[in-house]
Amino acid sequence: MRLIATAILGMSVCAFAQFSGRTGRVGGRVTFDDGGQTGGRCLVPGSGGGEEDIRKLDKVDGNGFVYARLRYHLQPWWWQETREVPWHHDYPDGDTMFPASLQRLTTVQATPESFQLVDIDSKELFLYPFLYMSEPGYLNLLPGDLKNLRDYLDRGGFLLMDDFRGNESDNSQFVNMKQQMMKLFPDRELKPLPANHPIFHLFYDVEPHDMLPPYRMFNSGEPQFFGITDAKGNVQVMIDFNNDISEYWQALDVGQCSIHEAGTAVQLGVNYAIYAMTH
């Protein structure tokens, strides 16, 4: 039954991908505030992108779900490991598919355009119930970022950190992410989330550890899920390590992933969004 349900979900998400307005990544060369540069498309993880696909909504509709992708400050060594600016990975294809899945599979009011690109130190954060951060292994939280992000999270906001890989004990990406979270919440512990945690069963019943890592050719470990919680035990920061659910989202309509992994990624995204709006 589980295989049948997964197959049905996979067919559903592939069907709604056709109307979601998927925008292909375009080539180009972009200079960012930190002086880093990124070139055009390249078929390796964390590459490609261009200035043409950076866009802003005319306004934020307060009656529907709109979430924000974070543009954050980077560690100075980021360019040694990836050609694309890390916060940009899977943008905007994954961002389009995420709200499209909410529109198709739930009663949440959303459209494929229900996302925004927001700077981490901007007060615009407080307009959105849900933040998405790509490749947090390269994150560098400055003093202004720390205050803004902590205020946002302590007022009930939710942050999903996704798309980084390696070994938990000696991987620079995981170690750096953990150091940044200790700066953000020195009084709170980053803990593994068990498979029976409510966030995995809120809307869909998901077996989170029954996923293949998206970058197996790079000898990444198995997918792991961590969380930082508030005093009431609510997850404020959700961390998908050795996983990349946005990569699975954007691959839904191009046949580059299995139905099981794509379906599970969609289910996780739906659960995360509903959790963010109800906790």
Predicted features along the sequence, with ranges:
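Hydrophobic h-region of N-terminal signal peptides that target proteins for export
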Residues: 9-17
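An acidic, glycine-rich "communication" segment
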Residues: 22-30, 37, 47-49, 75-79, ...
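Sec-dependent signal peptide recognition
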Residues: 1-7
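Aromatic-Pro/Gly-enriched surface loop or interdomain linker
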Residues: 17-130, 136-137, 244-245, 251-279
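Loop/turn elements at helix/coil->beta-strand transitions in domains of secreted/extracellular proteins
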Residues: 63-65, 126-130, 155-158, 188, ...
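Extracytoplasmic/secreted envelope proteins and their assembly/folding machinery
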Residues: 95-99, 146, 150, 174-178, ...
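Short alpha-beta junction capping motif
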Residues: 67, 130-174
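Surface-exposed patches in mature extracellular/periplasmic domains of secreted proteins
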Residues: 108-118, 161-165, 187-196
